[in-house]
């Protein structure tokens, strides 16, 4: 793909910017909110409320995943979304599959963290990235080197790797739940009388806790989308550029450099 690498990177970046917005809408802040609330009720020995909270959060994640995934699948073919580049349609539809299950995965991680179990969350993240990278590299090699196929198909399979990674992470989380479900259900502990908390109240608490995260993360995604949808319109106004040149410049601007500084951010977060 090296001859089309910048075009491929530009297409990949465009798909992921839209995908990131849908992920933010469906999950932003909710795992952290779940973690805090579960830890709060467990600290009060109200494990029954924690279990009710877990169920409410999982139902909420399932609903948001189905809604956001379906919407993204449907609007992928809208001209206002693909912005004149029909290659973006299969990329968005391949990413939509991941949105169906990523909210469930993210909520499950938050639940484990609420029980002070960091290992399942960390292992699931490692497995997610491992599966994603293996599938991405394998599919790209198969399409480009063996089948001599389209670079657009290779990009679509590279983005579909997010779904494969999410499945791997969900398997790890399910196995962890089977192993620790006795602890998570409060087996062997003295439980306080269950506080009467309605499902609606629990959902409102989750939403209230997650609002700051949604605002901040959505803001970042929206700025990236503004760049994405204005870049191709603005560049012809400042020079004579072909579509290929614009794609190359966009890849340098929105993808290649981003991946380098994200390494620094990841290291800074780890040290913090």
Locate each region found by the language model.
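Short membrane-interface helical motifs at transmembrane helix boundaries
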Residues: 67-86
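Interhelical loop/hinge segments that connect adjacent transmembrane helices in multipass membrane
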Residues: 151-159, 174-217
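Helix-loop junctions and terminal segments of transmembrane helices
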Residues: 28-43, 262-272
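Alpha-helical transmembrane segments of multi-pass membrane proteins
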Residues: 85-108
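Interfacial/gating helices of multi-pass transporter permease domains
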Residues: 3-20, 151, 155-156, 201-209, ...
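Membrane-interface junctions at transmembrane-helix termini in multi-pass inner-membrane proteins
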Residues: 103-125
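Hydrophobic alpha-helical transmembrane segments
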Residues: 124-138, 148-183
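Interfacial transmembrane-helix starts/ends
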Residues: 13, 48-62, 203, 207
């Amino acid at each position: 793909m090296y001859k089309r690498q910048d075009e491929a990177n530009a297409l990949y970046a465009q798909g992921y910017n839209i995908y990131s917005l849908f992920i933010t809408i469906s999950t932003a802040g909710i795992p952290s909110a779940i973690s805090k609330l579960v830890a709060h009720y467990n600290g009060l020995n109200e494990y029954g409320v924690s279990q009710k909270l877990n169920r409410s959060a999982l139902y909420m994640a399932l609903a948001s995943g189905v809604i956001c995934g379906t919407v993204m699948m449907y609007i992928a073919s809208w001209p206002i979304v693909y912005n004149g580049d029909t290659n973006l349609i299969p990329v968005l539809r391949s990413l939509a599959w991941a949105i169906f299950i990523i909210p469930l995965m993210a909520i499950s991680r938050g639940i484990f963290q609420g029980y002070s179990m960091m290992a399942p969350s960390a292992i699931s993240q490692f497995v997610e990235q491992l599966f994603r990278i293996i599938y991405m590299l394998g599919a790209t090699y198969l399409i480009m080197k063996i089948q001599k196929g389209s670079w657009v198909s290779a990009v679509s399979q590279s983005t579909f790797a997010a779904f494969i990674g999410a499945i791997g992470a969900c398997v790890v989380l399910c196995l962890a739940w089977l192993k620790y479900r006795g602890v998570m259900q409060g087996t062997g502990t003295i439980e306080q009388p269950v506080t009467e908390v309605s499902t609606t109240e629990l959902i409102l608490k989750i939403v209230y806790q997650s609002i700051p995260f949604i605002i901040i993360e959505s803001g970042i995604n929206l700025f990236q989308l503004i760049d994405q949808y204005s870049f191709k319109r603005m560049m012809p106004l400042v020079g004579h550029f072909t579509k290929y040149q614009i794609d190359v410049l966009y890849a340098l601007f929105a993808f290649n450099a981003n991946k380098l500084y994200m390494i620094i951010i990841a290291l800074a977060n780890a040290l913090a």
